[in-house]
């Protein structure tokens, strides 16, 4: 079972809880979601609790992260979109921290679970819909009517726009889930290959050198992917929020 590259993604119950026939068990996924929030919040607290005129290196990391997301949101949704900064920043930090924690041996990768990434995506799209109707009423529906479309093509174009909008939670969640799942499976396969070859003595160790180099390279690439996936999720969130703030802008 330990050689199965998908074994690392199994959700196991830590504290079984069942209420009214519904399973509310505390699992390893639950544990690492709590750990992700704790690590992210703890990092931000420790690096910003003693704010100095001349920032320390760690304080600079927090400040750069803050400005990075702020500028992304201003570019994606305009100055009016800054009201969503706490949400976008929290999503970015949660996904980034979860991705990085998942890189450690025997740690659970929360973002490799489609139910987690889909919940995050539904939260984003739900926020877009609720705020869009709250701010613009039925004017929010202008989002589905692009400018300059001939009347004869309007039903077809509106249908395509609605389907495209409703597919956003799927594309947003699957992109993150699939990248993290594929990356970790690839790492597990190469690492298992190295371990298997090493068991054949000196000749096997010699043959394991190339797979070992590949494993190290893939590990470095996976750390980059961990950041890029958090970045992409945040960028797309900003773009979707722009539809709620400026529904008739396209």
From Swiss-Prot:
One Pfam family in the UniProt entry: ATP-synt_A
Gene: atpB
SUPFAM superfamilies tied to this protein: F1F0 ATP synthase subunit A (SSF81336)
PROSITE patterns the record matches: ATPASE_A (PS00449)
Transmembrane domains' residue ranges: 26-46, 84-104, 114-134, 143-163, 193-213, 216-236
MF term (GO), any: proton-transporting ATP synthase activity, rotational mechanism
Topology with respect to the bilayer: Multi-pass membrane protein
Name of this protein: ATP synthase subunit a
Organism: Sinorhizobium fredii (strain NBRC 101917 / NGR234)
A GO CC annotation given for this chain: plasma membrane
Subunit structure: F-type ATPases have 2 components, CF(1) - the catalytic core - and CF(0) - the membrane proton channel. CF(1) has five subunits: alpha(3), beta(3), gamma(1), delta(1), epsilon(1). CF(0) has three main subunits: a(1), b(2) and c(9-12). The alpha and beta chains form an alternating ring which encloses part of the gamma chain. CF(1) is attached to CF(0) by a central stalk formed by the gamma and epsilon chains, while a peripheral stalk is formed by the delta and b chains.
Keywords, sorted A to Z: ATP synthesis, Cell inner membrane, Cell membrane, CF(0), Hydrogen ion transport, Ion transport, Membrane, Transmembrane, Transmembrane helix, Transport
Record-linked PANTHER family: ATP SYNTHASE SUBUNIT A (PTHR11410:SF0)
HAMAP family given in the database record: ATP_synth_a_bact (MF_01393)
Primary localization class, coarse: membrane
